[in-house]
Amino acid sequence: MTGLKPVAEIMFSDFFAVCWDIVANEIAKTRYMTDGQVELPLVIRSGNGGGSRFGAQHSQSVENWAMAIPGLKVVAPASPADVKGLLAASIRDPDPVLFFEQKSLYGTKGEVPEGEHVVELGKADVLRSGTDVTICALALMVPRAMKAAETLEAEHGISATVIDVRSLVPLDTQTILSETEKTGRLVTVEENPRLCGWGAEIASIVAEELFWSLDGPIVRVTTPHVPLSASDNLEDMQIPNADRIVDAVKGLAD
């Protein structure tokens, strides 16, 4: 409101629950309620998701909470290059952006372009092109989807397209629809519980737009509808992995 572009941090995205009134009722709605006279170009970075053994209150994936609030933009990078590019785009955006960083990806290494690097919000990234099935993934699920795609090709002769959704609001429906139409099959992979996850939204869009082009049902790979455990064995069973993705695709292909 004073011309600055603050970048705030919430260490664990679970704690959005503590400040949700401010985020959902004030920050998200100010531009609309002032007829565009007041902009809030705020970026809130937050550690999101499981896999780090932090337990039920520090491991939730809450990006689907934010998707339902008009006025908020929502992104979740999976690579070091996209962290730089999406963060730059988020800071330049006139609207508030929730920037979710999957905690288990903090140690990821990869090439990062030098100098200015901006990745447009609302643009998905097709990481791998295939002919038999399209897999949509986000954040930690992206490398797992890529691993699954390699296994599917090498061991089962199934060619998979992998899309890094990376921007949930705005959502790149054009790329998702185009790539799904090419293969006729869609699998979404996410850390959210099955009920009301972002995969359900993508599934509904694809069903509405491409129903007669699909060669099978849309399959969602998710966590179960239970709190994530701090136990290694239990958390590993809950969060989707490459093997579960392979099984889901094989079932669809059969």
Question: How would you name each of these model-derived features?
Answer:
Residues M1-R144, A160:
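Conserved thiamine diphosphate
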Residues Q37-V43, G51-R53, K103-D254:
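Thiamine diphosphate
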